[in-house]
Amino acid sequence: MVSAQIVGDTTLPAGFTHPHASEQARAIAEAGMILRVQVGSGVHGTSINGQDDRDEMGICLEPPEYVTGLARVPRGIDGSGDEIDFEQFQRHTVWDKPGGLDNRLGAGDLDVVVYSARKWCRLALAGNPTVLLAIFVPDEEVVYRNACGVELVDNAHRFVSALAAQRFIGYLRSQKAAMTGEVGAHTNRPELVTVHGYDTKFAMHALRLGLQGVELLTTGRITLPVPEPQRTYLRQVRRGDVRLDEVVAEVEAAEARLVSLRDDSGLPERPDRRWVDEWLHRSHLAYWNQ
């Protein structure tokens, strides 16, 4: 089935002093946008009682001087004169409040990142769990998608390979370490540890990564939002309704399943890099000639 174009909003928040939030980076992201979707707890179906910010991810094509030349963008809007390669535009609206970049995201805040298509493809080809979600988001959570974005989404399978197994395992282990307070782990939600004895949000994400990783490695796709009954269980974990020992057991079981699938998933050993290269080439040429 061919996905539909969705003519929605490409407007992004104004630039800021963050290195990836210059006005030039924002202009590139807006003008070249091919896909913009909701990600995070909202699309997973694991948000609770309006506690979450809204996470969005986008993908954009770049002007020719940034691809075939050496053009760069300013490092934020602080006028330092430093320049960096354009790879993404990143903006949190919570930065606009007193406290700026040190503020913690909360309910009603927007967290948006728009990757260059080239960077997004590099990450997706490596099996990065976070960026892969963008091509599995259901239409009702798509903010914007043009013809180029349609072609990308309809070829999601080109990016899926056994390489994703190790990435999901790594992400899961990182979240598990944070939820249990292992050496080197850090939580920015001490109130959850105080009330529940562990960081319930890290725990929920660890288990979610396990469930979604297993689905990807066995079916080649990720269902969003998380199907029932797993979705309800994830919400229970996030609320702290599940004992730590039970959560750890569930996460470790999912981790063991991922490890077993790492060498026996049935997926291609490598993604279709050739198709991706051709898609990037023709998509940029079409954008530059329009």
Residue ranges and their predicted role:
Residues 128, 176-179, 287:
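Amphipathic alpha-helical interaction segments
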Residues 2-137:
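An N-terminal structural lobe/cap that precedes and organizes the functional/catalytic core
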Residues 5, 24, 38, 51, ...:
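Residue-identity detector for glutamine
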Residues 273-290:
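Short, amphipathic C-terminal "tail helix"
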Residues 139-278:
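Conserved nucleotidyltransferase catalytic core and NTase-mimicking acidic/glycine-rich helix/loop elements
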Residues 18-20, 44, 49, 92, ...:
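Histidine (H) residue identity feature
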